[in-house]
Amino acid sequence: MKWLPNAESSQRPGMNNQEDLLNDETNEDLESLLRLSVSQIIRKEDSEQFLHWFRDSAMLIAPEFFKQFPNDLDARCSFLSVFGRAIWNRTPLPSNHFRTRSLPKPERNAPCTCGSGRKFKQCCASVETLGSPFENLSLLSFVLDSLSASQREALPYAYLNHEELAFVARQWMEEGREKESVKLLEGLFADIS
């Protein structure tokens, strides 16, 4: 997984307790879900279309990941809604200079985003207020993986989060992708100077 360093954690950078909770199969399922989600987001950059796709597809793509949740339809719908929004909110968008474009937090009395027909405060608000266990998850590497080499060379480095870029470069080094990592860092340093 692609976990950003947690400033409050004494663990090695890039690791969080969340990763320790996932077994290999679950981790692979979640990584596939995130990769496909980012691909879907990048393809259209349409939040409504993505959230609809996510609600319909997530459990089919990552069955091992979703086995760890109670077999309660309302709870799963709530989680899918909140998790889909979290993925959207963490995905850097090419049309926004590779910065995120977060969805507004639903109003308490507005219809719930999960489609239940209930008010948000009576439905998914309790799930959303728990905070996201994925707040330190980096989706930038999935975004960059979806780009061609020429698109990567033209990245608007001034707009990108430099800490996250450095994290992705280190991750790629660990994966044996040294040349790609160097090109990413060269672009970053060229933009800084």
Name what the model sees in each region.
Residues 1-193:
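Acidic/negatively charged segments and metal-coordination signatures
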